[in-house]
Amino acid sequence: PNGCPRRRGRQTYTRYQTLELEKEFHFNHYLTRRRRIEIAHALCLTERQIKIWFQNRRMKLKKELRAVKEINEQARKDREEQEHKIRSSSSDDGSIGKGVGIPLDASLLKSNDSQSVSLNHLTHKSPDGMMDKTPKSII
């Protein structure tokens, strides 16, 4: 009535469309225009819908990776705090606690970063013993 165009409602995708879009995203986070046209035609969606779905999916992935990083940082801080408590509660004779008599193992005090998920340094050895630096999935 006041001359403003009405905003479109939220797009809902069928399970099949979502599955196909997720499969494509698994292999490619970015689409060429040609591939976007192909997918739009195959799923009976517009190019714009495909483009926006991929933009939203990339933002979702970015948010998930940020959450994983925060969890790892918190785990590292918690581990360092525990190690500090162990160090400060150990007595002069190298045992943990008062009169417990359990020898303190120095290897327990070292940071164990292998429990953290590394986002940047996921490397694996290939069968020939060379390092393969291709990124591996963390999920």
From Swiss-Prot:
One of its GO terms (biological process) is negative regulation of transcription by RNA polymerase II. Gene3D superfamilies: Homeodomain-like. Keywords: Developmental protein, DNA-binding, Homeobox, Nucleus. Residues 6-65 bind DNA. The keyword Cell membrane does not apply. Residues 73-86, 125-139 have a biased composition (Basic and acidic residues). Belongs to the Antp homeobox family. Required for segmental identity of the second through eighth abdominal segments. Once a pattern of abdA expression is turned on in a given parasegment, it remains on the more posterior parasegment, so that the complex pattern of expression is built up in the successive parasegments. The abdA product appears to repress expression of Ubx whenever they appear in the same cell, but abdA is repressed by AbdB only in the eight and ninth abdominal segments. This is Homeobox protein abdominal-A homolog. The lineage of its organism: Eukaryota, Metazoa, Ecdysozoa, Arthropoda, Crustacea. The gene is ABDA.
